[in-house]
Amino acid sequence: GLTFAIKDNMDWAGVPTTAACPGYSWVPQQSAKVVHLLIESGAALVGKTNMDQFACGLNGTRSPHGPVPNAFDERYVSGGSSSGSAYVVATGQVDFSLGTDTAGSGRVPAGLNNIVGLKPSKGLISTRGVLPAAQSVDCVSIFARTVPMACRVLNAAMGYDPQDPYSRAIKLQTQAFPPIFKFGIPKQRLFFGDDL
């Protein structure tokens, strides 16, 4: 089976959830819904990852456990707040990992570590058992080294959860690109402040 890690704001039954704040630490009795689904699908959860405390930060340096380095050069930031989740995938420690994305916390570290970061449509993956940052927009994000792997994880992780008030039954659809690509050019190309 595939190996994976989760950001430390997600519950794993019997393992402390700290959100990178030792004073907050508590031990959940059940795993987050998405974690449960992935384990049931045969993936092996191997650990939790460091993060910007309470998912507040986009650089990966705001943790009492220390900063998470960039996977290519430790002189640079990894991006955050799902910094550890991006790092363990980029360095090949796991096949995929889970993070969260409210305002870039999944996409930023994915980009800075040159991996795939998938932020699904809100409600596609349950956030039950995930410590909220801004519950109306929080999403569980997926980190992988390839798009096919991220899609494989998404297929196992998604699904309606009646115990998550933001969960939605969404049917995934694809559409072929049109035969002719069209794009727009604004009539007014000079914007306020451009002449400064």
Task: List where the protein language model places each region.
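A short helix-breaking turn/cap at a secondary-structure junction
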Residues: 119-196
